[in-house]
Amino acid sequence: MAERSDIWRLHLVYRLSHSPQGFDEDVSRRVRALESVTSVAVVPSSDASTHLAFSTRYAHAVVAAVEAKQCLQEALDAHNATLWWWQRKVRRVDESAVRKVA
């Protein structure tokens, strides 16, 4: 059983219809601002998805995972709000997920 103080490395995994310049950095900044998150980095992926690695204590893992997905949605909404109606909106191609990494 994991101790409450154990550090868990999690990946927020998402794939977008297209990736606007600076979008991943915006998501990173939002996740980094979460209270329970200790580190954030974009890690390479072998497929077309983005993997945003972040660390949090075991006791905060579920809350941090939900909040990280919310940060992604907020970044999508903020970016799309700046576009005109004829410009192509950024969409998630599939459902985002948070996974524990060894």
Features from the language model and the residues they span:
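Long, contiguous binding/interaction regions
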Residues: 1-53, 57-102
